[in-house]
């Protein structure tokens, strides 16, 4: 039985390039727009000398601040620094990634200091932004969330995402797979339809790719098989375009743009061109002074773009074949193909999928950018104990994406839970010792599909000691694997003769954050949030002073006022305004109380003069804001029925 939570639970799609948040309200999902009015938020964080920017504000200044604007954190989360994919990605990034204990960290200059952040911390900043977006819309604190991950994320990547939620101050109710969330978005309103439906979710996003095959019947969503590539998406298509134009620039101008200093503006132009080519056959790129004062004007056709990415596009069909094979299903047994993720707007991708299924048209009934957050919001409502009829009987049965097992003698991988096993799942097997009088056993836990453990991914290990002396193969050691609904694994081992046991939650010791590190990062996240709020109020105070000074100046320049003001008063006030504006020019990074103090000083000069002027004139002169409020706002109108704002042509 689900208990009712103290605050609303939201669904967050934490994407490689864009993130999205939704909430279940009034019997439907509401996708929440951010402070810029956009329903998706760029997964970007920018660091400057004075502030931290998240989302649209960060992406908008990336060309001016490429070395300190970080994105693509999802491509690093839960990975090791020496991973081939991490090393390959680093060639395309303008920011710096450093190695600390085999873990990749982002390095930036922030407020004049060199700072490093883990991918979890960075992701927590995006999650915090989504949390604040939801709080602004709901008008209440948000403490609980369902966060989505690619179906093919491994155990350490899932754990790291959960840690990011904790750093953001969120209770992560559950980690769910993106294609499964999208399936909920597709199938929620189809619960009433009779019969079983086989639905293939084809989810190609900014940096990851998943395919899941589900059976939907009477509100039960059962995943039959899943496959994918956690390193394939729009970013890779952008990289192909960037490389193409770097070569073209080199041919035309004999200048090499490659390397760390590759202009960010070219990448932004390539991203825009790629989007345009989804609806146009050709597009042009025009960048003034791209490199060493050289303007770069060129064009590209859709056919050329498709040729540049042909192998990447074709590779999306491999996981489709794999899920059909694993689910033992023929192509013609798939009733619906649902496209999810912005990259599925590419016509070539749509055609490849359609051709693969013998001309069957994919279903485009759901918004590819919002479907995952939509499904996560529904799951959040269920876990939060929402009583709505629409979500009451909905049941999700997901699968383990990779086989989980232990190493046995000779480095052999012995799976306990095979891939595509429905989760939650529990499986136990009995093992024994290999040598005479062996006092203990080392349980090494792996995930992967290869026969030898050295070719698979080591998740963690622990020892079971104190086994009584005995010949080999006599002691009985029961190893149990327990995979929760999050896809996160717990392993225990017990010696049946002594009942001595040991267990671990797989924490991937090499890569996972410790409890202490998470607590430290939570405190730091709070500190950065406080600094962001202080920066916002400082800017507000600066803007308030600036607009007050300029409003005063405009008043003095008004002919109707100038003729009625004493010359000495006018000179005094003009001098005070000039001094304030001059002080502002030299104090752009002042403290909030400095701006407030300066405004009080200026008010001290202006208020007596303006009061004297208005008293002599018997009220505010025509066309003037009477009373002249320090903020520059007009006073309350005497006639409250009339308009309070006057239109200015």
Curated annotation (Swiss-Prot):
**Region (Disordered): which ranges?**
617-649
Q: Does the keyword Membrane apply?
A: no
Gene Ontology MF term list: ATP binding; ATP-dependent protein folding chaperone
* UniProt protein name: Heat shock 70 kDa protein
Report the domain of life of the source organism: Eukaryota
Return the CDD domains for the record.
Answer: ASKHA_NBD_HSP70_HSPA1
**Composition skew (Low complexity), residue ranges:** 638-649
């Amino acid at each position: 039985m689900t208990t009712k939570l103290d605050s609303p639970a939201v669904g967050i799609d934490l994407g490689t390039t864009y993130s999205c948040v939704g909430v279940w309200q009034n019997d439907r999902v509401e996708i929440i727009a951010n402070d810029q009015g956009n329903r998706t938020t760029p997964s970007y964080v920018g660091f400057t000398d004075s502030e931290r920017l998240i989302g649209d504000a960060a992406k908008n200044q990336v060309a001016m601040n490429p070395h300190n604007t970080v994105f693509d954190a999802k491509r690093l989360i839960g990975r090791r620094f020496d991973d081939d994919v991490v090393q390959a990605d680093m060639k395309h990034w303008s920011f710096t990634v450093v190695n600390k204990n085999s873990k990749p960290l982002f390095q930036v200059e922030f407020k004049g200091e060199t700072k490093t952040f883990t991918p979890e911390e960075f992701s927590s900043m995006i999650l915090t932004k989504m949390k604040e977006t939801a709080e602004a819309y709901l008008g209440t604190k948000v403490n609980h969330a369902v966060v989505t991950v690619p179906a093919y994320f491994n155990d350490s990547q899932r754990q790291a995402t959960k840690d990011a939620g904790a750093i953001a101050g969120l209770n992560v109710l559950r980690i769910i797979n993106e294609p499964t969330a999208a399936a909920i978005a597709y199938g929620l309103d189809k619960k009433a339809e009779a019969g079983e439906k086989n639905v293939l979710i084809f989810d190609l996003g900014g940096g990851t790719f998943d395919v899941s095959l589900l059976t939907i019947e009477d509100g039960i969503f059962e995943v039959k098989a899943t496959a994918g590539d956690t390193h394939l998406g729009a970013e890779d298509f952008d990289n192909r375009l960037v490389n193409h134009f770097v070569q073209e620039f080199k041919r035309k101008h004999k200048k090499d743009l490659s390397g760390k200093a590759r202009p960010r503006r070219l990448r932004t132009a390539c991203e825009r061109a790629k989007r345009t080519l989804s609806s146009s056959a050709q597009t042009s790129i025009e960048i003034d002074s791209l490199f060493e004062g050289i303007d770069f004007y060129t064009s590209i056709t859709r056919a050329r773009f498709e040729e540049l990415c042909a192998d990447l596009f074709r590779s999306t069909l491999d996981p489709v074949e794999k899920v059909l094979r694993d689910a033992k299903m023929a192509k013609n047994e798939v009733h619906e193909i649902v496209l999810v993720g912005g990259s599925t707007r590419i016509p070539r991708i749509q055609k490849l999928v359609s051709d693969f299924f013998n001309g069957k048209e994919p279903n485009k009934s759901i918004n590819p950018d919002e479907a995952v957050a939509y499904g996560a919001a529904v799951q959040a409502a269920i876990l939060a104990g929402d009583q709505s009829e629409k979500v009451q009987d909905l049941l999700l049965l997901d699968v383990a994406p990779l086989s989980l097992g232990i190493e046995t003698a000779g480095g052999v991988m012995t799976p306990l839970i095979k891939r595509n096993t429905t989760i939650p799942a529990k499986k136990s097997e009995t093992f024994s010792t290999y040598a005479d009088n062996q006092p203990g056993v080392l349980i090494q836990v792996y995930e992967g599909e290869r026969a030898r453990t050295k070719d698979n991914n080591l998740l963690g290990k622990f020892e079971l000691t104190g086994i009584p002396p005995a010949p080999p193969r006599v002691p009985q050691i029961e190893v149990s694997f327990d995979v929760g609904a999050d896809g996160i694994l717990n392993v225990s081992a017990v010696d049946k003769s002594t009942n001595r046991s040991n267990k671990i939650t797989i924490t991937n010791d090499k890569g996972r954050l410790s409890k202490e590190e998470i607590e430290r990062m939570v405190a730091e996240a709070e500190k950065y949030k406080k600094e962001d709020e202080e920066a916002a109020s400082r800017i507000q105070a600066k803007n308030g002073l600036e607009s007050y000074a300029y409003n005063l100046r405009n008043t003095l320049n008004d002919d109707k006022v100038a003729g009625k003001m004493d010359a000495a008063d006018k000179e005094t006030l003009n001098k005070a305004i000039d001094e304030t504006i001059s002080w502002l020019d030299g104090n752009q990074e002042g403290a909030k109380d400095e701006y407030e103090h300066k405004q009080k000083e200026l008010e001290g000069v202006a208020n007596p003069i303006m009061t004297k002027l208005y008293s002599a004139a018997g009220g505010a002169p025509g066309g003037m804001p009477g009373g002249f409020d320090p903020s520059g706002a007009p006073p309350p109108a005497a006639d409250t029925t009339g308009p309070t704002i006057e239109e200015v042509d």
